[in-house]
Amino acid sequence: MKSIKLFYDKILNNIEKINPHLYRFLTYNLYKIYSEIANSIKYKDKYFFHSVSLEISTYCNRKCHYCPNKDYETPKNFMSWDIFKLAIAQLKDIKYTGIVQYHLFNEPLFDERLTDFVRYTSTHLPKAIQVLISNGDLLNIEKAKELSEAGINKFVVTVHDTNPERNLERLKPVKEFLKEKMRLQTSNELYLASRGGAADIEKEKRKTDFKKCPDIRTLIICYNGDIILCCQDYFKKYIMGNIMEKSILEIWNSYKDIREKLLRDNITELPICKICLKRE
């Protein structure tokens, strides 16, 4: 299954070179269809999470114009090894084979334990696809090789400068080394969301107005073990539970009705969702 996903990803990378818009469409829609079919069979739930984001730390070195970090100082908190291992163990219990990422609003490369985390995930979730989302400021060939060997399957690096040419040039050798494993983009290519109202992006050109939430099917595990509603909940107002008190599966199923209303019925009830999906 993992080899099929990676082969599919390789094809999409080639499509992106020809037509970036088609790439975005296929990335979202084809993977959505595939994951819904697979999860319906495996978990009897078409909306089961296909991606997990582990907030291994809260620190980011950037103050990007579209991110709430530019307006708020975030304390430097780090996920403990005990919580990390518990999260991986619970994912292993349900035979999880989806995507594992190491970010929320943080820059993963600033955590010196990242390679060890990746290696641990590779050992205990060998069929999962590990993705590094990064601003690339600390990424070089040596670090890319280290992380790739530890188990990172895909590097997605976004250059956040207003004039990104310099950093794009700096990262070219890394891209040449990683080849199809790395997706290099600028912040101009991102879809912008208001982070549930925490970021003011009205002055920016929003790339997409989503009819349905694209993020509610990602499981977010915060540094302290809290599971929050989605990756747009910057202030962590909607805490669904904590993995040290209940299992991931119990917590995920506890707000199934919210997901189904959003994804199946297109009904938006929570204030954060109304703001994010522009339905105020």
Predicted regions, residues:
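Processing junctions and N-termini across compartments
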Residues: 54, 58-61, 207, 267-270
